[in-house]
């Protein structure tokens, strides 16, 4: 019979590390060494009562097995708990980093990062399963799947796209609005721009939606990280380029030079010049041309909007008062815009300065010329001074009359008093002569 050593270092080390097989074998060997007799097993003899050492050894063996089972279960629970904690912490870190990267990517490269991640997820989902398939499914649940919604979201979040849209609208309004204003102001006799040319011009403009290769390029859409002031504005078009664009859009219309005359403006715009009034005097100047000369691209005044709808005596009298004739008022600007040689204000001032009984007597007369502001001030000052002097002289005359009346009454009172006293003195003289 061979026996093993009592203390085996390998068995002890295996027991420490949680291996139950070696420890159980060592315990069985130790118990077999303590048993008397030649038998190697633990079973007692059938005819004899098992000794107390065997019972105690079996009890210790049961206790050791139970403790080892508890230790193994505890270690397994701890390992599972640590693995779950590590897994949850790793998932939280991955989710946090993923969310941080996603938010940073939205600000820096929204179109590229989101389109790439969506395409990568769509490519990996139909393929063979891999260990990171669950994480990819979580990523796809966070990201939008509809490409239309993705493009709409990118367009609202990216400031570069907003600036591109504003530049497109500016260029569109700058190139199309002059043609629209010209087509609205042309008369029925003039030929207008066809709808096909307008469609070609609108298609020739910068497209509002760029191609997909431009949308996915990060260098074309996003500014560099060092650029904090934003992209530089696009250089504005020169006057020659704008004239060429306008001529390309409207081939029938002529490009006007800045030094175009009023006749060219009137011929191009189709607005007839206001003819001079037939009843106006010969020396009356024509209406001011400033009311009909307007710059390129500005709206023109329509004299029919300011004319009277119904002819009446009041308007005819006002026209004759201001213009010196019996015609109606052609435009509001004819009344508001006056020159130095016009006679409208002069007629009114002549009516005020004349001594006629009725203003109707002055309607057929020309009246004086329009005087300067200095002459008006001088006349007003002379009128004021004359009024003040007239008022002062009237006051002085009234005071003089009052003083004269007071003096006259005083002198009359003094005379009556002297006569009364003279009468008494005569009576006293008579009584004295009679008493003597």
Swiss-Prot record:
Residues 81-103, 167-195 have a biased composition (Polar residues). Residues 273-289 have a biased composition (Pro residues). Residues 1-10, 45-54 have a biased composition (Acidic residues). It comes from the Eukaryota. This is Testis-expressed protein 44. Residues 1-142, 165-307 are annotated as: Disordered. GO terms for cellular component: cytoplasm. The lineage of its organism: Eukaryota, Metazoa, Chordata, Craniata, Vertebrata. It is found in: Cytoplasm. The modification Phosphoserine is found at residue 375. Keywords: Cytoplasm, Phosphoprotein. It holds the Pfam family DUF4678. InterPro entries: DUF4678 (IPR031460). Residues 234-247 have a biased composition (Basic and acidic residues).
